[in-house]
A protein has these predicted regions:
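Conserved HGGG/HGGXW glycine-rich cap/lid loop of the alpha/beta-hydrolase fold
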Residues: 5-68
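Conserved serine/cysteine hydrolase catalytic core
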Residues: 181-233, 238-241
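Active-site loop/oxyanion-hole signature of alpha/beta-hydrolase fold enzymes
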Residues: 57-100, 259
Length: 267
């Protein structure tokens, strides 16, 4: 039985032996949070809001936080990771778990949900389903910054040049306690930005869980395209738009974001 406390993680072993750290708090039905790029479990400002009536499990994806890594990284390995954690959480709870994934984590979650029956409801916040990787010159700039130890610069390149994040939002993120953890994940960026993140139609059609897609009304067009792709592929899917928000609405307006999630999960 998992001990649900915020003081330390428990671990799940993935298919290739990678150990994945999971941080749990709260009581009630299970909810798994899967973060995106430039993040670990500490990026979630909504944990306390969601844990009012749920056991919230926030995993560290491989290569960051309390999780280990492996040399042969592919998105497929990370999908296997999420499936492993979903099944561990569901086994501990004795019931299927709800799942919330953001960005790259959302991409992993929609693929994982097509492979396991242990997802009750699925929330995807701007899942990063992209047919083309970032331009080689941009990836090279990020890699050069990482190689030189300029991790903060690498993260800021991504936020400014890929997400088109307003300077006010970037300044807000810099002031948060999770900023050092974001910066520490910079070495994982080149690999994630060098590959397409494709959604197989058959895999998406296998998602049986009711699914909520959340998008920011002001988010970049490539994320809007991703929303349309997923909405047209997952059978039981609805879309909610957060007007005036972009890719970090859970940071800029956590109360509203959490309320949208909680309302859907009550269904």
């Amino acid at each position: 039985m998992v001990q649900h406390q915020s003081s330390g993680p428990w671990h799940v072993t993935s298919t290739d032996g990678t150990r994945l750290a999971v941080w749990s708090t709260g009581t009630g039905p299970p909810l798994l949070l899967v973060h995106g790029s430039m993040s670990d479990h500490r990026r979630w400002r909504i944990v306390d809001l969601l844990a009012q009536d749920r056991t919230v499990h926030a995993m560290d994806r491989r290569g960051r936080g309390g999780s280990t890594d492996a040399l042969d990284w592919t998105p497929e390995r990370e999908v296997e990771d999420v499936v492993a954690v979903i099944e561990a959480v569901a086994a501990d709870a004795g019931r299927p778990t709800d799942v919330l994934g953001h960005s790259f984590g959302g991409y992993l979650c929609v693929r994982a949900a097509g492979r396991t029956p242990h997802v009750r409801r699925l929330v995807l916040y701007e899942p990063a389903v992209v047919q083309h990787p970032q331009p080689p010159e941009l990836v090279a700039r990020v890699q050069a910054a990482v190689d030189a130890g300029r991790y903060e610069e690498a993260v800021e390149i991504m936020m400014r040049d890929v997400l088109h994040m307003p300077e006010a939002e970037l300044a807000m993120l810099r002031e948060q306690p999770s900023w050092p953890a974001r910066v520490a994940t910079a070495p994982t960026l080149p690999r994630e930005e060098s590959v397409p993140l494709l959604l197989d139609p058959a895999e998406a059609a296998g998602v049986t869980a009711p699914t909520l897609l959340i998008r920011g009304g002001d988010s970049p067009e490539f994320l809007q395209d991703a929303i349309r792709t997923v909405a047209g592929s997952v059978p039981d899917c609805r879309v909610v738009t957060l007007e005036g928000q972009q890719h970090v609405a859970d940071q800029t307006d956590p109360e509203t974001f959490a309320a949208v999630v909680r309302e859907f999960l009550r269904g």
